[in-house]
Amino acid sequence: MTNTVAALKILNAGVYSTIQDRGRFGLRHLGIPWSGVICPAWQEIANALVSNPPEAAVIECFEGGLQCQAESEPLLVSVVCSDDALIKSGPENTLSSSKPNRSYILAPGECLAIVSTGSARLAVFAVAGISVNEHLGSASTYAKASLGGLGGSLLQAGDEIHVNHAKRATGEAPTPVACILPDELQYQCSTIRVVAGPQFDHFSGNGQHTFSNSDYFLSTEVDRMGARFDGPPIEHRDASAKDIVSDAIVPGSIQIPGSGLPIVLLNDAQTAGGYPKIATVATADLPLPGLQRAGSCFRFKLVSIDDAINAIGHVQQLIEHTISAFTPCVQTDLDSETLLKTNLIDGVTDGLDESASD
């Protein structure tokens, strides 16, 4: 890498933090998954907050704990997450609470910490000018094959992420901006839109009805590969329909194994499988099982392919509207700690003393 410095240091990598971009496409025939961000909308908004290209790599942080520090130069960074996430920023030993869904300027030595991701399972962290080597056309981390990211692994304390000189927050300081995520981009919806899958007819009429008319609950078995659901078993057509000759699968495929309980495949999913696929999640709703927490209740809603295409177009419109409505941030985030340390009263006056108004 040329014209770069090691500018962002990972002090604490948290529970599970990786570098991700849009993904690694066109290689599934070689057994290489897409990978990429679980929530592309949050990636695009986080990058816009720091004037990065929409597809630039970001840090995807599951469950919080990530703490990063600007090293020798100021950095412009941002975090997009649920509104109730706990974000702190400032000098390493005196971090104070900050609002989410905005950009921040970190002076050398200052830190930003994603203490908790709140009601969502992850947050997206962007840094202006991030520079990460690509592997097979993408910087996305796929740890099982040591691809992408920094050395193909999860982020670790002590890692340094390079930043382009031209993109650092040097010279005239940029004004941090904030956004308000519309409800649909908060991804708290309980309906997952799906289109009928290639083996929809492997399920009985009762099974098809159960699938689209029952409540399913996100289990604790969720990672970047997929999400298992608990609920009423979905009946296969017969015993022979419970398995198929392994064929191609993609993120969003909904497999129904012999247990009858659905598995929604996510970004790091394998490229082939032998369970019948009753449906495929519409791209607009694919972030839902990756973002929501165990116990969340969903219903699968069958829609047409045209409806699914229109849904992702609507998401893009929401992203563009959110970006167009960015507002400048007030530079100081006053919290209780700051107020307690501040002298808010200078002297004492007598309200009856007319001279006090002079």
Where are these regions (language model features)?
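Conserved "landmark" site that anchors the functional core of diverse proteins
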Residues: M1-D358
